[in-house]
Amino acid sequence: MYINSGYHNHSLIDFKDKSRPLIVGSCGTYRLSSHQKLPTYRPRGRLDFQIIYIAAGRAHFHFDNADDDTIVTAGNIVLYRPKEFQKYEYYGIDKTEVYWVHFTGSDVKNILRNYGFPNDQHIFHVGTSLEYERIFKRIILELQRCQDLSLIHISEPTRHLRI
């Protein structure tokens, strides 16, 4: 299994911050091949937003309850909003590769709405692109270098993720 990630102020704790329009809290990637299973279970969700981009393979999501299983394939993103139930798994047999980013801010809801993300939807088809992977890797690197990611850094690349 390959893991690469970066965290705002090197903190693994989720946070809510309305001091700026958009603040990236963390970003990373997982690539499973031999690792059997990588589960995530957050019954009360998180304080921030999360986007998961499935770059390869597939992932299993349980949006409304732990028993429902929705398979999301490469070329899609999943959007979680604050305090939403989160349960999902990646399996090595699926050769899953995902990129994820957690973010908060005073204008996040408007930014998402302006880019075509309605409030009542979790899954968005965006297609696969090496450009998406490059954008996520750039965010990871900036977080690892302790650079502050502001709206300017994020808004331009997210235009490529627009549905």
Segments (PLM) and residue ranges:
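Short, charged, low-hydrophobicity "junction" segments
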Residues: 1-8, 108-111, 134-138
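A short, N-terminal "cap"/entry segment at the start of jelly-roll beta-barrel domains
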Residues: 1-23, 142
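Alpha-helix N-cap/helix-start motif at coil-to-helix transitions, marked by capping-box chemistry
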Residues: 18-21, 102, 126-133
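N-terminal regulatory/effector-sensing and dimerization cores
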Residues: 19, 26-119
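Regular secondary-structure segments
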Residues: 55, 133-147
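Short, solvent-exposed positions on alpha-helices
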Residues: 70, 148-152
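Aromatic/histidine-rich interaction motifs
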Residues: 114-137
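Single conserved hydrophobic/aromatic residue that forms the stacking wall/gate
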Residues: 152-163
